[in-house]
Amino acid sequence: MVKKHRETKETDISVELEIYGSGKCEIDTGVGFFDHMLNALCKHSLMDIKLVCKGDLFIDDHHSVEDCGIVLGSAIKESIYPLSCVERYGNSIVVMDEAAVECAIDLSNRPYLVYESSLNEKIGTFDSELIREFFQALAMNAGITLHLIRLRGDNSHHIAEATFKAFAVAFRRAISKNDRMGTPSTKGVL
C-alpha cells in the first residue's frame, strides 16, 4: 500500500493505492463526472484506490483533475519501480456501445503520452480537455509511456469512459506477474 499526500494553494490531495487489489474504490474529488471515470478505472484495473481531493472548484475543475493525475501517477511510480517480474507491456481495446478506444502501455520509466481523441467541449459540466490533462500528468509522474487512441465513437461520454477503461485493462495487463521475466529490459534496469 502506497500513501501520498500533496498540498498546494490550489489543491489538497490524499491517495492510498494498492496496485494488486480487487477494485475497491473510494473517490471524492468534488467533480462528479471525474469521480465516475476514476471509479471505472479502479474497477477494471483491479487497483484499490482511496483518493480525496479538495480543490479550488470555485475557479474550475482543471487544478483538481490535473493534480489528481500527478498524485496518482506518483503513487503508481512508487508501486511499480524498480520493475521486476511483470509483463511490462499492456494493451487493450475497450468498446462502449459505438465507441472504441485503444490503449498501449510500456512501464518504461520513460514518461510519454500520445493522446488522439476528439470529444465535445463539455460532457455535462465537465471540460473534456481535462481528460488529456489527467493522463498527461499521470504518465509523466508514473514514468510510463502511454498511448490512448480513439478508434471510433460519437458520444463523448462513451468515448471518455472507454478511454479510462482501456487504460485500466492495459495497466492491469502490464503489471501482471511473470516470475520468468526478471527485469523486463535488455538493459537490465528500468
From Swiss-Prot:
InterPro entries, per database record: IGPD_sf, ImidazoleglycerolP_deHydtase, ImidazoleglycerP_deHydtase_CS, Ribosomal_Su5_D2-typ_SF
Reaction catalysed? D-erythro-1-(imidazol-4-yl)glycerol 3-phosphate = 3-(imidazol-4-yl)-2-oxopropyl phosphate + H2O
Output this protein's name: Imidazoleglycerol-phosphate dehydratase
Q: Name one GO molecular function term.
A: imidazoleglycerol-phosphate dehydratase activity
Q: What is the lineage of its organism?
A: Bacteria, Pseudomonadati, Campylobacterota, Epsilonproteobacteria, Campylobacterales
One GO cellular component this record assigns the protein to is: cytoplasm
What are the record keywords, sorted? Amino-acid biosynthesis, Cytoplasm, Histidine biosynthesis, Lyase
Q: Which Pfam families match?
A: IGPD
Annotated pathway: Amino-acid biosynthesis; L-histidine biosynthesis; L-histidine from 5-phospho-alpha-D-ribose 1-diphosphate: step 6/9
Classify the main location. cytoplasm
Q: Give the family, as the similarity comment puts it.
A: Belongs to the imidazoleglycerol-phosphate dehydratase family.
Enzyme Commission number(s): 4.2.1.19
Example GO biological process term? L-histidine biosynthetic process
Q: Which organism is it from?
A: Campylobacter fetus subsp. fetus (strain 82-40)
Question: Could you tell me where this protein is found in the cell?
Answer: Cytoplasm
Identify the domain of life: Bacteria
